[in-house]
Amino acid sequence: MLVCLHLQVFLASVALFEVAASDTIAQAASTTTISDAVSKVKTQVNKAFLDSRTRLKTALSSEAPTTRQLSEYFKHAKGRTRTAIRNGQVWEESLKRLRRDTTLTNVTDPSLDLTALSWEVGCGAPVPLVKCDENSPYRTITGDCNNRRSPALGAANRALARWLPAEYEDGLAVPFGWTQRKTRNGFRVPLAREVSNKIVGYLDEEGVLDQNRSLLFMQWGQIVDHDLDFAPETELGSSEHSKVQCEEYCIQGDNCFPIMFPKNDPKLKTQGKCMPFFRAGFVCPTPPYQSLARDQINAVTSFLDASLVYGSEPSLASRLRNLSSPLGLMAVNQEAWDHGLAYPPFNNVKPSPCEFINTTAHVPCFQAGDSRASEQILLATVHTLLLREHNRLARELKRLNPHWDGEMLYQEARKILGAFIQIITFRDYLPIVLGSEMQKWIPPYQGYNNSVDPRISNVFTFAFRFGHMEVPSTVSRLDENYQPWGPEAELPLHTLFFNTWRIIKDGGIDPLVRGLLAKKSKLMNQNKMVTSELRNKLFQPTHKIHGFDLAAINLQRCRDHGMPGYNSWRGFCGLSQPKTLKGLQAVLKNKILAKKLLDLYKTPDNIDIWIGGNAEPMVERGRVGPLLACLLGRQFQQIRDGDRFWWENPGVFTEKQRDSLQKVSFSRLICDNTHVTKVPLHAFQANNYPHDFVDCSAVDKLDLSPWASREN
């Protein structure tokens, strides 16, 4: 009996050993399979990235780069962003290969070790990229270490947050509209360009201006957006689908998702079958892998921190500084001056798309904390103002504190400029965007809350594009009497994309600043949504190349990002969810528009968030409808309350410093950093010269005496 018992124990032990050995072998085999798959994909993706870079450089060296190549210059991922996007692409392609080459039944098959896959790819865990100093009074450049409990929260090169689960054709990455016969909620999605043509476009520019908002109101929105989010495009994943095939032949595949032209589109005669469109960069999923759906990257910090001035990567931040000076200054242009005032330095990476715009002027693009700084001339103008203000602050702080070294001067000036952007945005800008909804969504500040998630949400990147409806068709330059400046005082918008030469060699920024103050934004109108300058001539700075359609790009990008439809977001915000023409008509207060939308989408559930949100009537005293007020208000409240370095958070500034900061204004920024001497007191409101303008001596100055240290 005892012998039998020992034999049973022995046999059981052998069986357990065999199972354990089998598991070990299977695990080793699984690890080897993962390693092999990742290795092959890395080779393929690295080649795609290198080929893309080489091709772009070659194209910009040619005499006739395309619209696509000009815009790609600004959307091209660099540095750590490039690495994060490349890892995301390797992760996704490796997963596809493992599904294809192994017995995996689906991507969530428990036999696949997702942690092992992530480490093999190089994704790692979401940990800070810098060492956190909990006692530092200054933000990190990357946005890491803001939240002490979760130091990577809000940092650059992380995924945009999802407030609702992503919606893709396959549940993972394929956008709706990719597969021709695939439906969404029982209906095929309309072509993005068709929606643009039938809903967004208009011909007559008469009566489109906003009688209550200055052009600066529009421009500040773009500044804030560029401070908060940026999703560069990814590269194509394989040699089968090159960018040439995407751009020239409209061949859909990998990350090429061309915007096809509908029948009778006028662009069919001049631009072939499509506008090329490359999908946004995305990052690796993170543990515990509850969702493997593609999540797009935010390449900049989620905080309102002037990252567009200083950068979101340490290497860039360092290049932007004048490290040879002990004054904490930002580097400025050494080749050109604006009547004694500084310009941003040129980005001397050759070739430059800005030089292509005027081949005889030889003026490159500017370098700034955000790569998009030279996309259009008014954006470059405000970048110039912010750069000058940093250096003005640093010099004044040095005068007050001669013993401060360059690093302290830089950090203190950076901190003040960050507070300036926060104050202007929340005190002056958001109240006239959200109108009567302001207090509902952004109540008075109650202090920092480390449980609030400050990350920019994916949907916000579409909600904030309401500003595209505010862009007028022309840009005006005005003289010191606010009269037309020079023989070409009013210029079509499309001639000012990538146009730095007009600043450097044709008048400086003062005439443009006066235009921002005295001219008006466009008013969003349900019948006149986006000017043709953006809808047909985007990134068409010369007659040699054909323009893009920003509205169609926005709609295609909604699908690229896996955005839930209009009604999902209405439900998220506690608003009604119309199901019929009558219901949609009641929400939009416009039967014709409601019918046009349903003729295209068939159901309100499928309406893309960008067009659905912008189609709503504006709230009282605001410039967005109820849905966008909810999405924007919620996001800005989280940006504020989840930021440990928010200017009002006790301990960030002293009480006297906070009192002083409350006097900042955009008008004073102009007075201190240009030769403009007459400004309005309320720069975002529509102003008529001379009635609404005052001398700069009547505008409060920022008193920096509270920054004088006691050692003095």
From Swiss-Prot:
Ca(2+) binds at D227, T301, F303, D305, S307. The record marks R372 as: Transition state stabilizer. Binds 1 Ca(2+) ion per heterodimer. Binds 1 heme b (iron(II)-protoporphyrin IX) group covalently per heterodimer. Residues 1-21 form the signal peptide. The lactoperoxidase system is used by the dairy industry for the preservation of raw milk during transportation. Freshly obtained milk is supplemented with thiocyanate and hydrogen peroxide which are used by milk LPO to produce antimicrobial agents. Its EC number is 1.11.1.7. It catalyses: 2 a phenolic donor + H2O2 = 2 a phenolic radical donor + 2 H2O; thiocyanate + H2O2 + H(+) = hypothiocyanous acid + H2O; iodide + H2O2 = hypoiodite + H2O. The modification Phosphoserine is found at S315. Its main location: secreted. Residues 22-117 form a propeptide. Keywords: Antibiotic, Antimicrobial, Calcium, Cytoplasm, Disulfide bond, Glycoprotein, Heme, Hydrogen peroxide, Iron, Metal-binding, Nitration, Oxidoreductase, Peroxidase, Phosphoprotein, Secreted, Signal. GO terms for biological process: antibacterial humoral response; antifungal humoral response; detection of chemical stimulus involved in sensory perception of bitter taste; hydrogen peroxide catabolic process; response to oxidative stress; thiocyanate catabolic process. One of its GO terms (molecular function) is thiocyanate peroxidase activity. Its cofactor is Ca(2+); heme b. It is found in: Secreted; Cytoplasm. GO terms for cellular component: basolateral plasma membrane; cytoplasm; extracellular space. The active site is at H226 (proton acceptor). The modification 3'-nitrotyrosine is found at Y482. PROSITE patterns: PEROXIDASE_3 (PS50292). InterPro entries: Haem_peroxidase_animal (IPR019791), Haem_peroxidase_sf (IPR010255), Haem_peroxidase_sf_animal (IPR037120). Disulfide bonds join C123-C284, C132-C145, C246-C256, C250-C274, C354-C365, C573-C630, C671-C696. Belongs to the peroxidase family. XPO subfamily. Heme-containing oxidoreductase which catalyzes the conversion of thiocyanate (SCN(-)) into antimicrobial agent hypothiocyanous acid (OSCN(-)) in the presence of hydrogen peroxide (H2O2). Also involved in the conversion of iodide (I(-)) into hypoiodite (IO(-)) in the presence of H2O2. Responsible for the inactivation of a wide range of micro-organisms and hence, important component of defense mechanism. This is Lactoperoxidase.
